[in-house]
Amino acid sequence: MIKTVALVSLSAGTIGEDFVKHEVNIGLKRLKQFGLNVKIMPHAMKGIEYVKNHPKERANDLIAAICDEEVDMILCAIGGDDTYRLLPYLFENNELKEAIEKAEKKKIFLGFSDTTMNHLMLHKLGFGTFYGQSFLADVCEMEDDMLPYTKKFFEELIKTGNIKEIVPSDVWYEER
């Protein structure tokens, strides 16, 4: 079902930093092993300071991902604490609403934490969202594989475009 994933940094620009380069490479490799094509949006990997100081570019990345007909899923890089700064740029001249209305196919938006605000605004505009994994925290897991619970639901989502039932994990992981 999901063939192409757009990777966006709507809050923190962590994935553009050298100290997570190894993790990012693991995550990109994993997405390809799932059979996915990955489009890294233009500003997603510009680093913490750039992303922090350019909310308009973050908003443009989201709108571009929505408008890109090859993209099936928009995956948030990580949470953060200032996604709210995108709002003026997303709702200026109804750009976000128009992008969603013009999109010829349904897409999935996936992320958590600071991304909660994005889920609400996208849901209100009729865009499908799943409060779930982020790229850095979940896909880039620095072990041989993703955590089994995380992987199960991620695979279900990319294979079917939906998750039937989320069952709580019987295992709790703190630090591995």
Question: Where are each of the predicted segments found?
Answer:
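Conserved anion/nucleotide-ligand pocket segment
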Residues: 128-176
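Short, acidic/small-residue loops that bind anionic groups at enzyme active sites
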Residues: 90-121, 128-135
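Gly/Ser/Thr-rich loops at beta-strand to alpha-helix junctions
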Residues: 11-15, 78-83, 110-117
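Short glycine-/acidic-enriched loop or helix-start segments at secondary-structure transitions
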Residues: 17, 83-86, 119-121, 141
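Short, structured coil segments at secondary-structure junctions
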Residues: 34, 125-126
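ATP/NTP phosphate-donor binding region
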Residues: 1-70
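N-terminal small/polar loop signature for handling phosphorylated ligands or for N-terminal nucleophile
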Residues: 43-104
